[in-house]
A protein has these predicted regions:
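Residue-level signal for inorganic ion chemistry
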Residues: 53, 72, 106, 123, ...
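Phosphate-binding loop of NTP-binding sites
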Residues: 16-22, 102-251, 255-263, 342, ...
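Short glycine-rich anion-binding loops that position phosphate/pyrophosphate groups of nucleotides
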Residues: 60-62, 195-196, 218-219, 253-254, ...
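Acidic, Mg2+-coordinating active-site environments of NTP-dependent enzymes
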Residues: 86-90, 210-379, 402, 460-465, ...
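ATP-dependent carboxylate-amine ligase
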Residues: 1-27, 51-54, 121, 306-308, ...
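Non-catalytic positions within long, well-ordered alpha-helices that form the structural scaffold/packing
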Residues: 69-74, 182, 398, 432
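Generic hydrophobic/aromatic pocket-lining and core-packing "Φ" positions
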Residues: 69, 137, 178, 234, ...
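N-terminal leader/targeting and accessory segments in enzymes
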Residues: 1-105, 302-309, 330, 517, ...
Length: 537
């Protein structure tokens, strides 16, 4: 194991130096004196402001930091950064055009640009970011290198592990986590990068050595407005790579591969097609758990170099060949996630053998087509986040051996009729191809919070679209009642699929506890998949 060597570090605190890179529209009248003062900490939450802190007023969706400038002044702030100067404020104001951009610029400067001292890998896409980032870290750690993590499940920086509140944290927290990693001697880190995080400048001033766009499908369109706008935000991550960086693209995804000639970085492709530089051949998904041959052809890398301005990477240590892989996580999507992670770590100089061994021992992420029960019948749990996710999950199911399928489906709440219509239309394309025993939809009123309650318009869209098939169903108000119905109908050899986003988060906990009550002698084994679980508690 590589020894972690802690770095020496002193926060940059002189206000003038901190603000040297800002796009400042106006400074306060006393700037010539103020710029030599030392600030204590940067703050974007007025409740945390202390003596000599610099408070940055950010306009959010629910609150505007400009409304709390008086509070920041009372609590001893040295100065504030604002977009809109406030009259009669007893606090020096540094006026900028974009406070969110200023937070990122200030945070990176304050923490002395920690991303430049790491091999930082950024992963974006509609589906699979979490799994791919964890696979990447597992391979890096298998080689004996500590690896920091920032993503949907947790933030791990060497000092602590905390549950995440956002996939991509705000810029101030992000730079602090990256600085902690450097301080703890980490040389590698992997980070999920969301489209919203990119749009809100959370990763501005963050240097990525490599990045991947693993796929793109309809997601967050309520925020971005269109697929084109969504893609524009996602593509920022890869277009921001410098010429020494590596852009990893999905050869089988049209949105991803379209970036091949739009980036300055070197390009590598993964997938199942012959165009992929790292690909899976002889793929078998009959059990649900993939086996395949990992194929890497150095000549294909050279072909990539001819198709793009830059050579992919140093080929001297890479030999042609195929390497058998058996995954412990189900689904076709797991194959793509594994290929993406492998392609990224090959850039670090790791051998294909280490990659194949590490991904074979990966246990998966909760609620990503996760097998939570394997008895007379099996139970899989999937978050059905969007149409691409639904397609991947049901395609994997269609290639598996089972008797019949019992699907418990949580209608998605407060995401609008359009999202629900697209989800049900995707479901309807698959339901005739699956061996359905029962389709059991639920509103999950007993488990969701206010922000995820299914609205009347969403129920109406669901019912309208379900008229297009002949599958009988009853909508259950409560998830627990829907799960009772699933257990009443399931037969040996069947699969129960727990399908849905927030409305199904509690599904595995509820159904496994019901099974444990039926079989108390095996209670511990039945409930084992819930250990360490975050969703649904």
């Amino acid at each position: 194991m590589t020894k972690k060597i802690k770095a020496n570090y002193q926060a940059i605190q002189e206000l003038g130096r901190l603000c040297s890179g800002l796009d400042v529209q106006s400074f306060p009248d006393n700037w010539e004196t103020l710029k030599h003062c030392a600030i204590n900490q940067l703050q974007i939450d007025s409740r945390k402001v202390g003596k000599d802190d610099l408070f940055i007023a950010v306009k959010g969706f629910e609150a505007d930091g400009h409304a709390y400038l008086d509070q920041a002044a009372r609590q001893g702030a040295l100065a504030t950064v604002v977009e809109v100067p406030q009259p009669n404020l007893d606090l020096p104001q540094i006026v900028v055009a974009d406070s969110r951009a200023a937070v990122a610029d200030l945070a990176s400067q304050y923490y002395d640009h920690p991303s430049r001292q790491l091999q930082l890998c950024g992963i974006t896409g509609s589906n699979g970011k979490t799994s791919t980032s964890l696979l990447y870290r597992q391979i890096i750690q298998a080689a004996g290198w500590p690896c920091g993590l920032i993503g949907t499940v947790a933030y791990e920086d060497g000092l602590s592990k905390v549950s995440s509140s956002m996939t991509t944290p705000d810029a101030l927290d992000l730079q602090r986590y990256l600085r902690n990693m450097v301080q703890e001697g980490y040389e590698h880190a992997v980070m999920e990068v969301s489209s919203i995080g990119l749009h809100q400048n959370r990763v501005r001033q963050t240097h990525f050595a490599q990045a991947a766009l693993i796929n793109l499908s309809h997601e967050h369109l309520d925020y971005h407005g269109s697929m084109e706008a969504y893609f524009h935000e996602k593509s920022k991550l890869l277009k921001g790579l410098d010429e020494e960086g590596v852009a990893v693209l999905n050869a089988d995804d049209p949105w991803s591969i379209s970036l091949a000639d739009q980036v300055s970085a070197r390009v590598l492709r993964f997938g199942l097609s012959d165009q992929a530089d790292v690909r899976a051949e002889n793929l078998d998904l009959s059990t649900g758990f993939a086996t395949f041959d990992l194929c890497i052809d150095p000549e294909n890398f050279l072909a990539s170099a001819k198709r793009t301005p830059k050579t992919a990477f140093n080929l001297n240590q890479l030999e042609a060949g195929s390497y058998p892989v058996k995954l412990q996580v189900p689904g076709l999507h797991s194959v793509y996630n594994s290929l993406a992670a492998i392609t990224l770590v090959l850039c670090q100089g790791l051998t294909p053998e280490i990659c194949a061994q590490a991904v074979a021992s990966y246990g998966g992420v909760e609620r990503r087509f996760q097998q939570v029960y394997n008895g007379d019948f099996r139970i899989f749990d999937d978050h059905f986040a969007n149409t691409k996710n639904i397609d991947m999950t049901l395609k994997s199911l269609s290639e598996m051996d089972y008797q019949q399928l019992v699907m418990v489906y949580a209608i998605r709440g407060k995401r609008g009729p359009k999202v629900n219509r697209e989800n049900i239309q995707t479901l309807n394309r698959w339901l005739p191809q699956l061996k359905m025993r029962a389709f059991i939809p639920s509103l999950s009123q007993d488990t969701v919070g206010h922000y995820d309650e299914v609205q009347p318009a969403e129920i109406a869209v669901f019912q309208e679209e379900m008229q297009n098939n002949n599958l009988p169903y009853t909508i259950y108000d409560e998830l627990e009642a829907a799960l009772d119905q699933a257990l009443a109908q399931v037969q040996p050899g069947d699969i129960i699929l727990l399908a849905g986003c927030q409305g199904m988060d509690a599904g595995a906990r509820l159904i496994l506890n019901k099974l444990a009550e039926r079989d108390p002698a095996h209670r511990e084994a039945i409930l084992a998949p819930l250990q360490g679980r975050v969703c649904g508690w």
